[in-house]
Amino acid sequence: MANQPRYDPLETSDFFADGMSARPRIAGTVARGDLSTDPFFDTGKIDGKLADGFPMAVSRELIDRGHQRYDIYCSQCHGRIGDGNGMIPSRGFRKPPSFHTQTLRTATTGHLFDVMTNGFGAMPPYGSMIPPSDRWAIVAYMRALQLSQNATVGDVPPADRAKLDAPPAAGAAPAHGGSH
C-alpha cells in the first residue's frame, strides 16, 4: 500500500504523448464552488460591458464590511481616505490615483470591481485573495469615501443641516487642532 504506482506533481510521463503527468482540465469543467450563476456579481459586467450599480442592496452593514476590508487590503497604498497617500507611496513607491478625481468619481462600479479583481497599471490583481462579496463591499465603501470628500451642504439631509452650524455641546471634545 505504501508504494503504489503514481506520479509526483509535474513529473514526466512516458504514458501521455505530451510527456507530462499533470493533465489539463477538460474544456467546460468547473471546479467545485466556482460555478458562476450571476456574471455581474462575479465580474462587474453585464453582456461583457462594465456595468454600474451593485448586484446586491447597499446597506450600512455592507459599507462597514467594505471599510474593514479596505483597511486591510487597500489603505496601505490608497490611503485611509482614498487620496493615494498611503504608507507604501510615502516610502518611494508609485502613488496610486486618488479616488476623488473626476475620472474615478464617474467610473462605473463595474470598473472599480474589475480593477480590484484583475489589477491595472502598477496595481496587482486581488481577485484570488478577496472574494467577490468583499470586493463589492469595498466598492460600496469607496463610493462612500468619494461622497465624504466631495459633499456639499445640499447633500446633507435637511434634518441634519442644523447640526452643521450648531455650537458644540457643553463638555464635548474639541475639534481636531482645537485646544483643550
Q: Language-model segments: what does each one mean?
A:
Residues 10, 39, 75, 121, ...:
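A generic secondary-structure boundary signal that marks alpha-helix termini
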Residues 91, 116-117:
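Short, flexible turn/loop "capping" segments at secondary-structure junctions
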Residues 2-61, 130-141, 164:
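Periplasmic c-type cytochrome electron-transfer domains
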Residues 79-105:
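Histidine/lysine/aspartate-rich catalytic loop segments that bind and position anionic ligands
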